[in-house]
Amino acid sequence: PNARARAAAYPFQMSGGQRQRVMIATALACAPKILIADEPTTALDVTVQAQIFDLLNDLRRQSGAAIILITHDMGAVAEMAERILVMYAGRKVEEGPVDQVIETPRHPYTRGLIACVPHIVAEMSEDRPPLTEVPGIVPGLDAFGADRCLFAPRCGSATAECAAARPAPRAFPGGQTAACVHAGPA
């Protein structure tokens, strides 16, 4: 609680949550209109994660600043964001209102990210969908300029069409777009 003592402390003398708060305070010192939070809760326990998100939400309301949240944590996205832009290998693959994208993901990578999130059930006896992972590995940097779908090697729906050209974004109702020739409801 003693801010003056914390300002003189070394990072190794602080917890992960304290270091994160110092970084947020440093970023906000110049009153930015946009705050870019890149994986702001990585390696923090869930209680501290919730505190950081509460802090960011409070700061957003008080300052009016926009927050760009860069994360793989779809739970964080659901809590913090109004819109989501899902990227894969440096390319936008899906975009839209958060509730809509999480409820009806159109791109296979987005579906994979959402399937990785554990589902909470009321009773331990209730069936829970098994956790899944997105198979394969991210392409090497040499593939990033390729005129094809970079997710195709990891995609269960991939066809020859995916390797033929980079998919153009397709529009869906409600302002949702997905760059996939097989884009559709989950």
Residue positions per predicted region:
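P-loop NTP-binding/switch modules centered on Walker-like glycine-rich loops
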Residues: 36-40, 44-126
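A short, proline-enriched helix->beta-strand linker immediately N-terminal to the Walker B motif
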Residues: 29-33
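Conserved ABC ATPase "signature" region
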Residues: 1-5, 114-115
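Interfacial catalytic loop of ABC nucleotide-binding domains
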Residues: 5-10, 96, 129
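ABC-type ATPase nucleotide-binding domains, specifically the catalytic core motifs of the NBD
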Residues: 1, 13, 96, 142
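Conserved ABC ATPase signature
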Residues: 10-14, 18
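Charged, flexible cofactor/metal-binding loops and thiol motifs
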Residues: 97-186
